[in-house]
Amino acid sequence: MYEQNSFEAKLRELIENHPSKEKEIRPWGGFITLWSDENFKVKILLVLPQKRLSLQKHKFRKEKWVIVEGEALITKGNKKFIMGEGNTLMIEKEEPHRIENRSKDKILKIIEVWMGEKLLEDDIERIEDDFGRV
């Protein structure tokens, strides 16, 4: 079993050393923007072991997820299910969703594609959050 601090250090190193100018560390892990255009944005989400993003929805964008490494517990609407490497999922505008990394020893990596009329980080309505950001 690995220490959470070693995962946080590894994640910080991955994000800080990436050449992208748009990257951020969050309480659940972090993200790196790989490409941004007028109508779409491509990011990689890095979710720390035993962490999850807020249960959230978006007014102006839909999202497509591709699990590239690890296994995720997904909440989509009122359904929960497991997705593994290679699985994809579409999240529609206004649809509540969440990603959770249930692994104890692996960073979850997801490619996230935003599509919509406004592609802003603040297009988020948090419904539930482990870090007090609701």
Named regions from a protein language model:
Residues 77-96:
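Short acidic-glycine-tyrosine-enriched beta hairpin
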Residues 49, 60-73, 77-78:
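Glycine- and acidic-residue-biased ligand/ion/polar-headgroup-sensing regions
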Residues 53, 79-81, 123:
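Short beta-strand segments
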Residues 2-25, 98-134:
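Double-stranded beta-helix
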